[in-house]
C-alpha cells in the first residue's frame, strides 16, 4: 500500500513549482484569477519576500502541491491508497481524494491564510528531545499556561505555540533542560494550531458554509483525529484544524498499522519524509 503525503508551511522555497506552471497553464491561469496576482512570479521570483508571509505561503504551497500531484498521477498512473497532509497540506490531500476541485481548494486556502495572518504577535518553536507528555509536564510545572502544543511532528519533536513573549520564555526554559537537544524558533508571526486561532477558526467556519464537498474517494487522514475524515464532519474537522494540534505522529502510526505501507512526499522539499523516518525508527525501537 502507498500513502501520498503533502507538506505544509515551512516547506516553501523560492523556485518551487518551476516547470509546473507552464505545464498546467489552464490551472495556473485559474489560480491567478482567484488570487489576483501571478502565482508563477510569487513562487519563482519571491517579490518582497512574500513567499514567507502566511497569506501568500498557503496559496502558493497549495498550488505547487496540487500541480505536483496532478503531474505524478499523469506520469505514473498510480493512485494512492491513502492520503494525508501536514496542516495546509491536508487541503491537498482532500483535493487528491476529490472532496473538492482545484478552484474550491484554492479559495479555501486563500481565506484560511488571510484569517491566520491577521492574528499577529504570536510565535512557535520546535522542541527536540522531549516527547509530548514531557513537554506538557514542563509547561505545567513552570506555569506556562498560555503556551499550547501545536504539532506532534515526531515522537521527540514537539512544536509549541503561543504569544511571542511566552514562547521566548518557554524556549529559554527548555534550553536549560539536559534532555533537550535543540530548541528552534519557527519563522512565523502567528500562534498557529493553538487557542489564539479561535477567532480565525470561527470566521473560517462561517466561510465554509458556502461550499459543497464530495465524499472522499480515498481515505484522508485528519490532523485533528489521526484517523480518516468522515463525510458528515468534513467542514467541522477542517475548521477545527486551525486551532487544534497536528497529530502527525499518531497519523503516521495509524497508517503503519494498516500493514506494509510506503510513503511518498508530493510537493516541495522532504520535511515530511524526514519526520516519517523518525516515527518509523522510534516504532522499531519500541519493545514488542
Swiss-Prot record:
Role according to the record: Involved in some intermediate steps for the synthesis of the antibiotic polyketide bacillaene which is involved in secondary metabolism. It catalyzes the transfer of the malonyl-CoA group to the acyl-carrier-protein AcpK (Mal-AcpK).
Organism field: Bacillus subtilis (strain 168)
GO cellular component: cytosol
Family: Belongs to the FabD family.
Keyword Signal: no
UniProt pathway: Antibiotic biosynthesis; bacillaene biosynthesis
Its EC number(s): 2.3.1.39
Keyword Protein transport: no
Catalytically driven reaction(s): holo-[ACP] + malonyl-CoA = malonyl-[ACP] + CoA
Stretches assigned to coiled coil: none
Primary subcellular site in the record, as a coarse category: cytoplasm
Gene (UniProt): pksC
Name of this protein: Polyketide biosynthesis malonyl CoA-acyl carrier protein transacylase PksC
GO molecular function annotations of the record: [acyl-carrier-protein] S-malonyltransferase activity
Localisation: Cytoplasm
InterPro entries membership: Ac_transferase_dom_sf (IPR001227), Acyl_transferase_dom (IPR014043), Acyl_Trfase/lysoPLipase (IPR016035), Mal-CoA-ACP_Trans/PKS_FabD (IPR050858), Malonyl_CoA-ACP_transAc (IPR024925), Malonyl_CoA-ACP_transAc_FabD (IPR004410), Malonyl_transacylase_ACP-bd (IPR016036)
Domain of life: Bacteria
